[in-house]
Structures are given as C-alpha cells and as structure tokens.
Regions:
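Long amphipathic alpha-helical coiled-coil segments
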Residues: 283, 381-387, 469-472
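Helix-loop-helix "hinge/cap" segment bordering the ligand-binding cleft or interdomain interface
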Residues: 122-190, 206-246, 306-313, 320, ...
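Loop/turn elements at helix/coil->beta-strand transitions in domains of secreted/extracellular proteins
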Residues: 16-20, 48-52, 73-77, 123-128, ...
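Short helices/loops that flank or line small-molecule/ion binding pockets
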Residues: 63-75, 167-174, 249-260
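Secretory-pathway/luminal and periplasmic proteins that interact with or process carbohydrate-rich
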Residues: 87-91, 173-181, 190-195, 262-263, ...
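Extracytoplasmic/periplasmic substrate-binding proteins
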Residues: 25, 189-208, 235-361
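Conserved small-residue motifs centered on glycine
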Residues: 313-434
Length: 472
C-alpha cells in the first residue's frame, strides 16, 4: 500500500507544513472564507502542522467550477460532489483512490461509516470517497400549507396514498379558487414510488420492497402509467398549476407567496421545518412512501482530486472534520458572534445574530453538504435531537437489494445521452400532468427504444448480476 513503503518517509512528509485546499458549495464571501480558514487552521496546525484554505462557490456554478478544477493542474485537496457526477472523473483518473490512506490517516471514519455505505463509493475494488453522514434514505410525501389544510375540515391524517389526496385538493380548490392546489418545483414533480434507479440513467428495480433484481424500464410499468393518468386527470380538473412543467419557480416560494397550497417532496426528519424556513408558512407533510435507501441516496461524497500533492494529508484533515465537533462547526456554521449565536447553549441550538439573515450572511450554513452534520450545532426551529432522529431514519429504512452497487456507464455513453434527451422531452411534462399518458407514453417508449434504452438496461443488468455474485 502507498503509505506502507516505510513509516519513516510517511512520518517525515507528515511533519512538513502543508495547506489542504477545500472546495465546498454554497454562497460565502471571500473575506469570511479567509476568517473561517484561519480559525479552522488553528486546530489542524497544532495537530498536524496543516493549514486549511476553504473556497466556496454558489450552487449555480459549482459543478462548472469542479470540472474546470479537475481539468486543470491547480492544486486542490478535498471537494464535495454529488456521487452521480463523478463516475467519468474516476475512470479518467481525475479522482484518487483513498483505500491505502484510510487505515493510517482515516481510521475513525473507516470504523464509523457502515460497510454498505463504503460499498457505494467503491469502484473496481478501490474506495474513492467518503460518504457524508446525513440522511441516506428518502421517503416521499406531500407538503402543504397547514392553515389552509385545517380550514378544509378534512381529516388529512388518514391520507396514506397519492390517490387519497384528491378530496382534499378538490376542497382547497373550492375554498381558495386563486390558489393552485399542487405546484411544481422548477418544472418538476417527484414520483411517489420506491424504485431504485441503480445509479441513474435508464434501468431500475421497480420496487425496493421486493427481492427482485430484474432491471426494468420504469417508464414501461403499469405503476408509472397509473400515476401519470392520475396526474393528467388532476391537471384537467385544475388541481395542478398550469404550465407546471415549464415553470422556473421554486415550489417553496410559490407556497410562501400564497399562490400554491402544496407540493410533492422527499421526506426525512426536519423536512417540515426546512420548508417552513423557505416558505415562511406553517407546513404539514403527509408521508405517502415509506423511507428506503439505495446507492443513489448516499449522494453527497467528499473526494480527493488528482491535483492533491499529499492525498494522505487530505484524508487526515477529512477524518478530523468528520470526527472533531470544534472543526466541523467552524466549517459548517462559521464563527460565533459573526455567523451564528447560541440561543440554547446546553442543547447546542443556534440562530443568526442580530442583523444577520439567511440572505445577507457572509457564510451560508449547509450542514448536509459537509462530511458530518451530526456533530454540528442545530439551527433554531429544528428539533434539538434532529441528528439522532436522522440516524434512526437511516437505520429503519427499507434497504434496496442493490444498495452498494455502483453503475458505470462508460461503455454506453452515446445511448445514455440519447435517452437523457428523450427523458427530458417527455418525463417532466408527463409527471406534471401536462400530457395525456395513454397517447404519450407509447411514443416516449418508442423513442427510448430507438435511443438505445435496451442496450443500457442489458449492460446494467450484466453489471448488477456480476456485483450480486461478488457480494453474496
């Protein structure tokens, strides 16, 4: 292994002064990043003779920044990324394997992270990243304006399926004719399904609650047809906002401005508070699909790019961020008195200081985007034990029989691109109720076939079968 050559050389390189450069998402000013880097470095310099330099880039241009950096020789040691974006970067050597460094430099993370989560970031026998310790499962449901829902007089606590929403939506339309009962989120509406998309592109397991490992085209299932018929019917009845699939507005803003009553959403502990924070309305969420976990749900991963001069030092710092609450809080929440203040120190609850808001802070707090939100302070409005609830949510989720399988689409790139274009043409419009599924889905399936969907499905089935065989 890399550090096994001689512990002496590892030791001497480990005493040299080194700066670990970190790229993370979210809005932050250069000045604030510099102050935070300085505060974080105090911890790592004393321990490892290592400084930290944090750069943050807003979500709109983050992926572009990652691609530019990976393609350049500019030094970078640690970066956040959605796992689905990196298979090609891994196969082209732009991201480094870290297997050889974990025992000596990342042993705390190694033991704290579950075997099935490590599998999700393992390619060709090598571990390539560290999965973020956030919710790693999802349920699906419907989030709605509580005041309006209560005013209908309908007992919504008994609603357990998407179909059962209809009487409530009808009543809202009748009582609030100027409000859209359902709004989309930037032109899309989530499906209320528990399929496993096996890492994206076409080809899924129809339901994680079954043992079947047959890879199918989800768009060809009765389940998809029936859900699309329901949505089309609702759109015809005026229960879904018109132009839902072409809207560029965020669902929570539409609910906040009073234009919308409800939206489909992922569910997890604290989802109500999250939507309340963004919409300014009291929210209630109905659970329609019970929580489940797949490889795709282990979706935020920290990587060591090829342009790190000392990957072992990057892994060492990552291990410290994952396990040291003092360091994690500086990087996640910023500086006390500037970016946050305690409202309940005993329970580790924080809020913005006077005059600071979510929109004017110099350092946005995004706990889930960092390696381990579970050791950070909790923002006011959330349950103080939100992180314990999240662990419980993860532990109780239905586990897909393919969790840990990592899809590599390298050999079917042309088909993947062609199918993605077809899916973009029909998917959102069907899912928002804008197209008649009985006439549209057959066309959709024909075009997917012509684009090479069967080739992708066969390749995915082959890889999945190999993986299942190797992981018996």
């Amino acid at each position: 292994s890399a550090q096994g050559s001689s512990s002496k050389s590892a030791e001497s390189s480990n005493n040299d002064s080194y700066t670990v450069k970190i790229l993370a998402p979210g809005d932050a000013s250069t000045d604030d990043c510099a102050k935070i880097s300085e505060a974080a470095s105090k911890i790592t310099e004393e321990k490892f003779n290592t400084k930290i330099e944090v750069t943050r880039v807003g979500f709109g241009s983050y992926d572009q920044q990652v691609n530019l950096t990976l393609a350049s020789s500019e030094k970078l040691d640690l970066m956040y990324e959605y796992c689905g974006n990196v298979t090609s970067a891994i196969s082209s050597g732009q991201i480094l394997p870290i297997t050889d460094y974990l025992d000596s430099y990342g042993s705390d993370m190694k033991s704290e992270i579950s075997e099935s989560d490590w599998k999700c970031v393992t390619f060709n026998g090598n571990i390539y990243g560290v999965p973020s310790n956030k919710e790693k499962a999802t349920g699906w449901g419907f989030a709605m304006n509580k005041e309006m829902a209560d005013a209908t007089g309908i007992d919504y606590s008994s609603i357990k399926t998407e179909e059962e929403l209809e009487p409530l939506l009808e009543k809202v339309k009748e009582m609030y004719p100027d409000v859209y009962p359902i709004v989309s989120h930037v032109g899309s509406m989530s499906l209320m399904a528990n399929s496993d998309d096996l890492g994206g592109d076409i080809g899924s397991l129809e339901s994680v609650s079954s043992d079947s490992t047959e890879v199918i085209n989800y768009y060809a299932t009765d389940k998809y047809m029936n859900e699309m018929k329901l949505r089309y019917d609702w759109a015809q009845k005026g229960l879904i906002m018109p132009d839902a699939s072409t809207s560029t507005e965020m669902a929570n803003s539409l609910i906040g401005s009073g234009k919308g009553f409800g939206r489909f959403t992922n569910t997890k502990p604290g989802i109500e508070q999250e939507i309340e924070k963004e919409s300014g309305k009291e929210i209630v969420v109905l659970d329609l699909v019970e929580p489940y976990t797949t490889t795709t749900r282990v979706d935020i991963v920290w990587y060591v790019p090829h342009n790190s001069d000392k990957p072992e030092r990057a892994v060492q710092v990552l291990n410290e961020i994952y396990t040291n609450p003092d360091l994690a809080n500086i990087l996640i929440n910023g500086l006390e008195g500037t970016h946050y203040e305690f409202t309940d120190k005993d329970n580790g609850v924080i809020n913005y200081p006077d005059g600071v808001t979510a929109s004017n802070t110099g350092y946005t707090s995004l706990p889930w985007a960092w390696p381990n939100e579970a050791i950070s302070y909790v923002w006011e409005g959330n349950d103080p034990d939100i992180w314990d609830q999240t662990q419980e949510f993860n532990n109780n989720a239905v586990v897909s029989p393919a969790k840990g399988f990592a899809w590599d689409n390298t050999d079917v790139q042309n088909e993947v691109t062609a199918c993605a274009n077809v899916t973009a043409k029909y998917g959102p419009a069907l899912e928002c109720g804008s197209l008649d599924p009985e006439t549209t889905i057959p066309k959709f399936l024909d075009e997917l076939k012509a684009a090479g969907a069967d080739t992708i499905i066969a390749e995915k089935q082959r890889q999945l079968d190999d993986w299942l065989e190797a992981n018996k």
